[in-house]
Structures are given as structure tokens and as C-alpha cells.
Amino acid sequence: GAGNTTKLANQIIVACNIQAVAEAFTLAQKAGVDPEVVYRAIRGGLAGSTVMDAKGPMMIAGNDKPGFKIDLHIKDLNNALDCAHAVGAPVPMTASVQEILQWLHNNDCAAMTTAPSPSITSV
């Protein structure tokens, strides 16, 4: 129903946003720019988000204490992909993020939160 579809839509946005934030900070770090400086510069603009404010400082600090586990995101994204396929909705970004999370699961990172530090996303 509408409630379940709304939850799936929320999980798509959250998971994709977390991945985008992690990739942005990885880019900054690999380019020699302090991710904290990048975070402060962009958080008030259009790229800023509740997810960035909640997860960005954790990523920058390398805090990977368990929170919402990767396995739960995988379950939610699998459900979202099933729903999308059933109704014919293209969700390529969701599929890509699900594959990344599945890789983390398969490589013994399943206990991590979905707020990996930039060094994790560069694997």
C-alpha cells in the first residue's frame, strides 16, 4: 500500500544520499582537500541535507560504530527494487547502491553502519 511504498521511497533517498556523501568526501580526501572543510563549505547549500549533517561528521571522523546496519539497508533496497520492477519504475541508482552494500556485506563489513569513512568507500 501507500505506507509501504512511502517507506521504500524514503529508504531509496536515504541510502543513495549516504552513498553520495561518502563518495564526495572520498573525492575530497583523495584530492588532498580536508573533508571537514568541504563539509562546512557545502552543508548550507543545495547539497546539504539531514543525511549529510547526521552522517557526514561520522564519516569524516572515521566513526563506524554500528547504527542502522548495512544488512537492513540491503533488505530495504531489495524490497524497493522488487517493487520498482513490479510497477515498471526505473531505479538504476538504487540498484547501484544495493550492489555496493551487497559488496560490503560479502566482504565482512556488514556490521558497519551505512556511514563509512572516506577510506572505506575507496576500496
Residues covered by each model-derived region:
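Active-site-proximal catalytic alpha-helix in oxidoreductases
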Residues: G1-A31, I42-A54, L72-K75
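Short amphipathic alpha-helical surface patches that mediate protein-protein
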Residues: A2, R43-G44, Q98-Q102, S119-S122
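Interdomain hinge/lid region at the active-site interface
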Residues: N4, I13, G48-C109
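Residue-level detector of well-ordered alpha-helical segments, enriched
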Residues: L8, V38, M93-S96, T113
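Helix-loop "lid/cap" segments that line or gate small-molecule binding pockets
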Residues: L27-A28, C83-A84, I120
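Beta-strand segments within the central parallel beta-sheet cores of soluble alpha/beta enzyme folds
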Residues: D34-R43, A95-E99
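NAD(P)-dependent dehydrogenase/reductase Rossmann-like domain
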Residues: L104-V123
